[in-house]
Amino acid sequence: MFGLKQFYQNEVRTKLAQELDIKNPMLLPKLEKIVISVGAGAYAKDMKIMQNIAQTISLIAGQKAVITKAKKSVAGFKIREGMAVGAKVTLRNKRMYNFLEKLIVISLPRVKDFRGISRNGFDGHGNYTFGINEQLIFPEVVYDDIMVSHGMNITMVTSTDNDKEAFKLLELLGLPFAKVR
């Protein structure tokens, strides 16, 4: 792998400064963290499946996953306060760039009928979120080891509050956005 962090520092920053007309290099947008999360849904009651989901995310991210718990009880969903409802991993620095590079170069091309990720995942504050339907696109996941097939949400948090600047940053980093029709 070619080192996405070096690519960002050597090439992306200069292109961003030119295209966004930013003179101060400290004001250039940068990727701060990537959060990978899974909601267990109907499998929340089964702790073995929850452990398997957390283990799968840990394999994908290269860092131990945290099991998330419900903040309050919701009778309609049969959830009690403190009950395990999902798992998440927050990646920063070297692991963040390694994961992003693996996602762009290896995993997303393995998605069937892939035409790019949606441009509609920006939240208005410079953060981008998209979902993946199956965890099997990652090379670390072995089909025989998973108990249940699940997707995941991937959130990329940037240092800018502007969606246009965040889009330009992610596009220059190599995220394959879908073409506008």
Swiss-Prot record:
One Gene Ontology term of the molecular function aspect: tRNA binding
Record-linked HAMAP family: Ribosomal_uL5_B
SUPFAM superfamilies assigned: RL5-like
Protein's name in the database: Large ribosomal subunit protein uL5
Cellular component GO terms, alphabetical: ribonucleoprotein complex; ribosome
Keyword vocabulary terms for this entry: Ribonucleoprotein, Ribosomal protein, RNA-binding, rRNA-binding, tRNA-binding
A Pfam short name: Ribosomal_L5
Subunit structure: Part of the 50S ribosomal subunit; part of the 5S rRNA/L5/L18/L25 subcomplex. Contacts the 5S rRNA and the P site tRNA. Forms a bridge to the 30S subunit in the 70S ribosome.
InterPro entries reported in the protein's UniProt record: Ribosomal_uL5, Ribosomal_uL5_bac-type, Ribosomal_uL5_C, Ribosomal_uL5_CS, Ribosomal_uL5_dom_sf, Ribosomal_uL5_N
Organism superkingdom: Bacteria
Family, similarity comment: Belongs to the universal ribosomal protein uL5 family.
Biological role stated in the UniProt entry: This is one of the proteins that bind and probably mediate the attachment of the 5S RNA into the large ribosomal subunit, where it forms part of the central protuberance. In the 70S ribosome it contacts protein S13 of the 30S subunit (bridge B1b), connecting the 2 subunits; this bridge is implicated in subunit movement. Contacts the P site tRNA; the 5S rRNA and some of its associated proteins might help stabilize positioning of ribosome-bound tRNAs.
Biological process annotations from GO: translation
Keyword Transport annotated: no
